[in-house]
From Swiss-Prot:
Name this polypeptide is given: Envelope glycoprotein
Disulfide bond sites: C248-C251, C248-C484, C476-C483
Known glycosylation sites: N120, N237, N266, N271, N277, N280, N295, N308, N322, N328, N340, N358, N488
Ranges for region Immunosuppression: 459-475
Record has Translocase as a keyword: no
The keyword Oxidoreductase belongs to this UniProt entry's keyword annotation: no
Organism: Simian retrovirus SRV-1
The gene coding this protein: env
């Protein structure tokens, strides 16, 4: 009895020590695998399509194209935004513009559009290619314009497919055309108002010294970029995927940066007093910049009512998430400042660090992460330092998004701070990224205010990065429109590519010094890829007829031996039985 008692308690203790996952494995690992497969919105893992999918969960604006999360595969498919047929020419509007025009038309309703004028008013005109119903807000939640005017996303004119229609060039308040020309006009208007606001709060000096770009060596990197990469690498060192930090490549996307926006994990921001009595809020005014909303499902949304069309700053509606609850910030007495390390993400997924008193629209609070991908060191990467003598097919490189490498996606999805590092530890990286955006925008603005000849330099350095590719002897390795930096246990290795290039250069010199390799006046490297197929063809032509004749002879002998073989009939004598006596009886 005593033995059974101890045995029972031993089983209880062991069951508490070892964690058992029921089912087919850890669901967090499955979620991580799914998110890695689907990728980020602007990566377009589902490819580029000509028309938007019929069923999609959410949409994300990516500047020149729109990403759709397809229902059946959950991969992001991208559709290019329509372009103007003639950007410099404004013609006359069709006659039907006099009788009928629309407030807004969705960008997926046409492929190209054109500006036109009639009666001193500018319209947009295009030929409709599809039908689409407008989408409205729910009647049981607060809306910006009230329940009677809660239109959010414009649609296509009804029964106008194949016909030319006209609509206003100026955007309507709180109505989006899906990343079309009206949304672009709204962004320009908002940017100008923020520039005016910034100049009024921080007056410029009357004299600016000439700002010339700093000449950097081939092995130098922009300070902001290096600090950002170093911070990311330090986070990898303390995350659940710390083995990646020992040997990996950190890849930045070339072009304008589009950071990832994650839901702000703070339950204290569920009421308006959190924003107006915020002790860690700094009113840092930055121009609105594009972000990629990631893992937004049900969020606490901020909204401000429409007040006056001539003075309000319409930041649009956050259509990439479902608002589970709303916080009314209408007619605030003071500007709204985002807490440190966070931003307001509003319509067309534009991020703001500061919202003035006359803003209107709806936004959500988010934390930023840089759009950085990781390549494990075990993954072979091409080093474009020398010409390859033998043709090799290019293989796809498997990039791991930073948000997955740090284990943030599973922590956000499960509502925990688990998988290695708490979400609060990423605030430093988000704050650094926001400050970097501010520094880049300030530098660009200073350069734009100077000599016109620097305009091209400004555009080339829009990112604030000095990205020199491997062909130029720099520290950046260009892979699939990304710039990759090598890192190990000690941090970012500045001379990794240079060492690889030196090794490859030594091998090339060894090949050049080999007389066999330099034979035929240097034509041998180009003949070598053909030697394999030529040798195979020569072997076939040489031994093919012999093998064929041997095979035919063998088959012929087999047939002849079968034909010459006599047919044997197997039989045996029948035994006679003796019944009774003899048939002849001699007397």
């Amino acid at each position: 009895m005593n033995f059974n008692h101890h045995f029972t308690w031993s089983l209880v203790i062991i069951s508490q020590i070892f964690q058992v996952q029921a089912g087919f494995g850890d669901p967090r690992e499955a979620l991580l695998e799914i998110q890695q497969k689907h990728g980020k919105p602007c990566d377009c893992a589902g490819g580029y399509v000509s028309s938007p999918p019929t069923n999609s969960l959410t949409t994300v604006s990516c500047s020149t194209y729109t990403a759709y999360s397809v229902t059946n595969s959950l991969k992001w498919q991208c559709v290019s935004t329509p372009t103007t047929a003639s950007p410099t020419h404004i013609g006359s509007c069709p006659s039907q513009c006099n009788s009928q025009s629309y407030d807004s038309v969705h960008a997926t309703c046409y492929n190209h559009y054109q500006q036109c004028t009639i009666g001193n008013k500018t319209y947009l005109t295009a030929t409709m290619i599809r039908d689409k119903s407008p989408s409205s807000g729910d009647g049981n939640v607060p809306t910006i314009l009230g329940n009677n005017q809660n239109l959010i996303i414009a649609g296509c004119p009804e029964n106008k497919k194949g016909q030319v229609v006209c609509w206003n060039s100026q955007p309507s308040v709180h109505m989006s055309d899906g990343g079309g020309p009206q949304d672009k006009v709204r962004e320009i208007i908002v940017n100008k108002k923020f520039e005016e606001l910034h100049k009024s709060l921080f007056p410029e000096l009357s004299y600016h010294p000439l700002a010339l770009p700093e000449a950097r060596g081939k092995e130098k990197i922009d300070a902001h970029t290096f600090d950002l990469l170093a911070t990311v690498h330090s986070l990898l060192n303390v995350s659940s995927q710390r083995q990646l930090a020992e040997d990996c490549w950190l890849c930045l996307r070339s072009g304008d940066p589009v950071p990832l926006a994650l839901p702000y994990d703070n339950t204290s921001c569920s009421n308006s007093t959190f924003f107006f009595n915020c002790s860690n809020c700094s009113c840092l005014i930055t121009p609105p910049f594009l972000v990629q909303p990631f893992n937004f499902t049900h969020s606490v949304c901020l909204y401000a009512d429409y007040q006056n069309n001539s003075f309000d700053i319409d930041v649009g509606l956050a259509g990439f998430t479902n608002c589970s609850s709303y916080i009314n910030i209408s007619k605030p007495s003071s500007p709204l400042c985002a807490p440190n390390s966070s931003v307001f993400v509003c319509g067309n997924n534009k991020a703001y660090t500061y919202l003035p008193t006359n803003w209107t629209g709806s936004c959500v609070l988010a934390t930023l992460l840089p759009d950085i991908d990781i390549i494990p060191g075990s993954e072979p990467v091409p080093i474009p330092a020398i010409d390859h003598f033998l043709g090799r097919p290019k293989r796809a490189i498997q990039f791991i998004p930073l948000v997955i490498g740090l284990g943030i996606t599973t922590a956000v999805s499960t509502g925990t701070a688990g998988l290695g590092v708490s979400l609060t530890q990423y605030t430093k990286l988000s704050h650094q990224l926001i400050s970097d955006v501010q520094a880049i925008s300030s530098t660009i603005q200073d350069l734009q205010d100077q000599v016109d000849s620097l305009a091209e330099v400004v555009l080339q350095n829009r990112r604030g990065l000095d990205l020199l590719t491997a062909e130029q002897g720099g520290i950046c390795l260009a892979l699939q429109e990304k710039c990759c930096f090598y890192a190990n246990k000690s941090g970012i290795v500045r001379d990794k590519i240079k060492n690889l290039q030196d090794d490859l250069e030594k091998r090339r010199k060894q090949l050049i010094d080999n007389p066999f390799w330099t034979g035929f006046h240097g034509l041998l490297p180009y003949v070598m890829p053909l030697l394999g197929p030529l040798l195979c063809l020569l072997l076939v032509l040489s031994f093919g007829p012999i093998i064929f004749n041997k095979l035919m002879t063998f088959i012929k002998h087999q047939i002849e031996s079968i034909q010459a073989k006599p047919i044997q009939v197997h039989y045996h004598r029948l035994e006679q039985e003796d019944h009774g006596g003899s048939y002849l009886n001699l007397t």
